[in-house]
A protein has these predicted regions:
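Non-heme Fe(II) oxygenase catalytic core, chiefly the N-lobe of the double-stranded beta-helix
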Residues: 1-180, 186-216
Length: 216
């Protein structure tokens, strides 16, 4: 298969774009019945189950979140399991001026697990190549707003996420075997829709190394 080595694909694509360094690929296996002795299946990052995964930007909980991600569909269920993206640049541009002033200079606190050191990132970030502003919060990883009451911060994150995930800003991909998708985590959020675990879903993933977030 020409995409068996997904790291080669992302290496060539991302270096053609901006010189980002690719990481090795990993399989995301979602199966009801797993091969005996395959310890990878117990890792939730590889097998997160069949439920819906919340909106997020990859590795937003790290000090230098990853830039590009690539998914390659190998085995796809008959229904469900779609991946959906939203455009955070368009979402920011569509905010009214009062909302833009409200979030200017704010920072969100992000974590995947309390066992890990949280990462603080600007709520509005600058894309280094285009200079465009984009929202950078997600309901899946952004926990509260630095310096705010926690409940009020969560409410703001929720409002921004609800705004950003309007259908006008979103694309939902219906997977077919052999499909390849690539996206820029600096200007998007994504989620996976749920599916029946009686069916197999195997998707290969690879990504580039991270970079520091530029505040607006």
């Amino acid at each position: 298969n020409p995409l068996d080595n997904a790291s080669d694909l992302v290496f060539y694509l991302t270096n053609a774009i901006d010189g980002s360094e690719a990481k090795s690929p990993s399989d995301q296996r979602h199966e009801k019945h797993h091969q005996a002795g395959d310890k990878r299946e117990k890792n939730p990052s590889i097998n997160p189950g069949g439920g819906e995964l919340a909106w997020h930007s990859d590795l937003q909980y790290m000090p230098e979140p990853q830039v590009y991600s690539v998914l390659y569909g190998i085995e796809i269920p008959a229904s469900g399991g779609e991946t959906e993206w939203c455009n955070m640049t368009l979402a920011y541009a569509a905010l009214d001026e009062e909302s833009k002033r409200e979030i200017e200079g704010l920072r969100s606190v992000n974590w995947l697990s309390r066992k890990l050191e949280p990462a603080c990132h600007p709520v509005v970030r600058i894309h280094p190549a285009t200079g465009a502003r984009a929202l950078y919060v997600s309901p899946g990883l952004s926990r509260y707003i630095e310096g705010w009451d926690e409940a009020e911060g969560r409410a703001l994150i929720g409002r921004l996420a609800e705004h950003a995930t309007q259908p006008a800003f979103c694309y939902r991909h219906q997977w077919q075997p052999g499909d390849v998708t690539m996206w820029d985590n600096r200007v998007t959020m994504h989620r996976r829709h749920g599916f029946d675990l009686a069916e197999r879903r195997i998707v290969r993933r690879t990504q580039t190394v991270g970079e520091a977030v530029i505040a607006a």
